[in-house]
From Swiss-Prot:
InterPro entries: SAM-dependent_MTases_sf, Trm1, TRM1_arc_bac, tRNA_met_Trm1_C. Belongs to the class I-like SAM-binding methyltransferase superfamily. Trm1 family. The keyword Nucleotide-binding does not apply. The lineage of its organism: Archaea, Thermoproteota, Thermoprotei, Sulfolobales, Sulfolobaceae. The gene is trm1. It is an enzyme of class 2 (transferase). It comes from the Archaea. This is tRNA (guanine(26)-N(2))-dimethyltransferase. Its EC number is 2.1.1.216. GO terms for molecular function: tRNA (guanine(26)-N2)-dimethyltransferase activity; tRNA binding. PANTHER family: N 2 ,N 2 -DIMETHYLGUANOSINE TRNA METHYLTRANSFERASE (PTHR10631), TRNA (GUANINE(26)-N(2))-DIMETHYLTRANSFERASE (PTHR10631:SF3). Zn(2+) binds at C246, C249, C263, C266. Dimethylates a single guanine residue at position 26 of a number of tRNAs using S-adenosyl-L-methionine as donor of the methyl groups.
Length: 378
């Protein structure tokens, strides 16, 4: 395997040379014997900031590939007492050894095992699950492997089922009814969290989001794990519901059950999806710490993008409602000229943009107030 050295953050690692695995002038990371995707640098950059605040004694990257994620945590975030890197691909495990040595890390433990098998053998304060596709096969094992109110970080790249395009796949993987709705970019994340909560409950544990976001073609989610059947029951009863959207007028709201419910505005039957999580997507105290800290990482290649994302999330996080997609709402209302988002925000007064969609707004003001602004500004 021919290797190429690349720099990401403050580390230098060897990866399979893309030139050796191109097909008709194109390259996909999955074609190489060991997976490395430079497009996920933004994901890893933000994760470096998160781990720097958590300072876990034990870090476990269960699906390490080249080892880039765990190595960056150790070099840039926090020199943990123990760094555990694993990949079931023997070629990847060998490459991890090279990259660990290349970055002067002496206390790393490298495994060549199935991720689930390893997670049932050892415990960790911070576990990273960054698979190719869905994280569902690793939810139970990773939640079970946490200690001391540990953290599990999940990446999900299978947006088709989560956003309602592949309804059968969503039912199979996430045990949720789903449709493509106006706010599906956010609802997909909520379906993912809901699935994790239900899986954790079977272990008499529960999870709460610490920080989460959507970017490019994936969701990234950090959850804190708590033990106790009562806590699991309380979280399910309080934060797992369904979501309804009116296909005629665009009104949307959380609903208690998956049953025929009529829109209170126009009387049309709701399209209902779920179950899904209805609580906050971020821990506000932790979010504030991220905002206070991220400037220390101005060397990151995606620093400006991180700054922009955190600024938007800081503003939208205070609102409890799912965002409204103004473009799709205007289409349902047959408003041909969509008003500028900034003008709608000014009209509403108490509202913000959302990082989920460029034409989305988040506010706890009522549907009628939003419609008034949209129509008055056209």
């Amino acid at each position: 395997m021919k290797l190429k050295e690349v720099t990401e953050g403050k580390v230098r690692i060897f990866v399979p040379d893309p030139k050796e695995y191109m097909i008709e002038g194109k390259f996909d990371p999955s074609w190489a014997p060991v997976f490395y995707n430079p497009k996920m640098t933004f994901n890893r950059d933000l994760s470096v900031i998160v781990v720097s605040l958590l300072k876990p004694k034990i870090i476990l990257d269960a699906l390490s590939a080249t080892g880039i994620r765990g190595i960056r945590y150790y070099v840039e975030s926090w020199k943990s007492e123990q760094l555990i890197l694993n990949d079931k691909n023997s070629t990847a495990a060998s490459l991890i050894q090279i990259n660990v040595k290349n970055n002067g890390i002496e206390n790393a433990k490298i495994y060549n095992k199935d991720a689930n098998a390893l997670l049932y053998e050892i415990k960790s304060e911070y576990i990273d699950i960054d698979p190719f596709g869905s994280p569902v096969p690793f939810i139970l094992s990773s939640v079970n492997a946490t200690i001391r109110n540990g953290i599990v970080a999940f990446t999900a790249t299978d947006l088709s089922p989560l956003e309602g395009s592949s309804r059968t796949s969503c039912r199979r993987k996430y045990d949720a009814i789903n449709y493509k709705l106006s706010s599906s970019k956010e609802l997909g994340l909520r379906i993912l969290i809901g699935k994790i909560i239900r899986e954790a409950a079977t272990l008499e544990k529960t999870v709460h989001p610490l920080f989460s976001f959507y970017a490019d073609y994936y969701y990234r989610l950090f959850v804190i794990v708590e033990s106790g059947a009562r806590k699991a029951d309380e979280n399910i009863n309080k934060n797992l519901k369904y979501f309804g959207e009116c296909p005629r007028c665009g009104f949307q709201t959380f609903v208690d059950e998956n049953c025929k419910t009529k829109c209170p505005i126009c009387g049309e039957n709701f399209i209902i999806i779920g179950p899904l999580y209805i609580g906050p997507l971020h821990n506000m105290e932790f979010l504030k710490r991220m905002i206070d800290t991220y400037s220390d990482f101005n060397y990151l290649s995606s620093f400006n993008r991180i700054q922009k994302l955190l600024n938007v999330i800081e503003k939208e996080a205070k609102y409890k409602s799912v965002f409204y997609n103004i473009s799709k709402l205007a289409s349902k209302l047959k408003v041909s000229a969509i008003p500028p988002i900034d003008s709608i925000l000014e009209c509403l007064g108490d509202a913000s943009k959302t990082h989920f969609a460029p034409t989305g707004i988040r506010t706890d003001k009522g549907y009628e107030e939003i419609i008034r602004c949209v129509k008055s500004l056209r």
